[in-house]
Curated annotation (Swiss-Prot):
Gene name in the database record: FAM174B
Organism expressing this protein natively: Homo sapiens (Human)
One GO biological process term: Golgi organization
Signal peptide: 1-26
Induction data: Up-regulated by Golgi stress-inducing agent nigericin.
Stated name of the protein: Membrane protein FAM174B
Length: 159
């Protein structure tokens, strides 16, 4: 049950398709529907003390410098949120691609660790496999029983 790796040229094409599909869909949806309206900066009264700020926040006192700074930060927050909502399909595709890449990387690393563990067990069991032939000297352990050639056990000495 071995996973078949994707051919090298197919992986970048797959990633490109994942990135391009939501972006193309979003651009088609934007071209069909009306363009996103810009934040209503022209219809709002300028920040500062005046009746516009008092009715907007629902407070009876005239707005001072504190309320004007909260207006500008609120406008900036609305602008940032609207930009994020406009680019939501692209952000979603980017997160999906990053998640897929991370998952693939973790799976490859786990597979590599698992396979190297099998190799280490074989190396410990049959140490002669990984040792160069020039460094191995084999001598029979049971020299007194020379009639049984099949059951001779060898001692490995490293030089």
């Amino acid at each position: 049950m071995r996973a078949v790796p994707l051919p090298a040229p197919l992986l970048p094409l797959l990633l490109l398709a994942l990135l391009a599909a939501p972006a193309a869909r979003a651009s088609r949806a934007e071209s069909v529907s009306a363009p996103w309206p810009e934040p209503e900066r022209e219809s709002r009264p300028p920040p500062g003390p005046g009746p516009g700020n008092t009715t907007r926040f629902g407070s009876g006192a005239a707005g001072g410098s504190g309320s004007s700074s909260s207006n500008s930060s609120g406008d900036a927050l609305v602008t940032r949120i609207s930009i994020l909502l406009r680019d939501l399909p692209t952000l979603k595709a980017a997160v999906i691609v990053a998640f897929a890449f991370t998952t693939l990387l973790i799976a490859c690393l786990l597979l590599r660790v698992f396979r190297s563990g099998k190799r280490l067990k074989k190396t410990r069991k049959y140490d002669i496999i990984t040792t160069p032939a020039e460094r191995v000297e084999m001598a029979p352990l049971n020299e007194e029983d020379d009639e049984d050639e099949d059951s001779t056990v060898f001692d490995i000495k490293y030089r």
